Every structure is written in structure tokens, then in C-alpha cells.
């Protein structure tokens, strides 16, 4: 998981999710696109 100050969609399959006040990017097809805003 990458921790970044600004998260953006890398590919069209990415989903932006808000959990516990943090913003995450998840992608089931490409798990290496996982990001968290930190």
C-alpha cells in the first residue's frame, strides 16, 4: 500500500473509498494500485 498526501485514480478500475476518515484507493484487478491518504 502506498501512503500519499494526495490520492488519485491511476486506472479506471480504481475505486475511491472512505473508511474511518481516511481516503483509500482500492483495485481488485491490480492490487499494487492500493493507496491511502496519510
Swiss-Prot record:
Gene Ontology molecular functions: structural constituent of ribosome
Lineage of source species: Bacteria, Bacillati, Cyanobacteriota, Cyanophyceae, Synechococcales
Domain of life: Bacteria
HAMAP family: Ribosomal_bL36
GO biological process terms held by the UniProt record: translation
Entry keyword annotation includes Ribosomal protein: yes
Protein name: Large ribosomal subunit protein bL36
Claim: Acyltransferase is one of the keywords in the record: no
CC per GO annotation: ribonucleoprotein complex; ribosome
Record keywords: Ribonucleoprotein, Ribosomal protein
One family name in Pfam for this protein: Ribosomal_L36
Family assignment from sequence similarity: Belongs to the bacterial ribosomal protein bL36 family.
Amino acid at each position: 500500500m502506498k501512503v500519499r498526501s494526495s490520492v488519485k485514480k491511476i486506472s479506471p478500475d480504481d475505486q475511491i473509498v472512505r473508511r474511518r476518515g481516511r481516503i483509500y484507493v482500492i483495485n481488485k484487478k491490480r492490487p499494487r494500485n492500493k493507496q491511502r491518504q496519510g
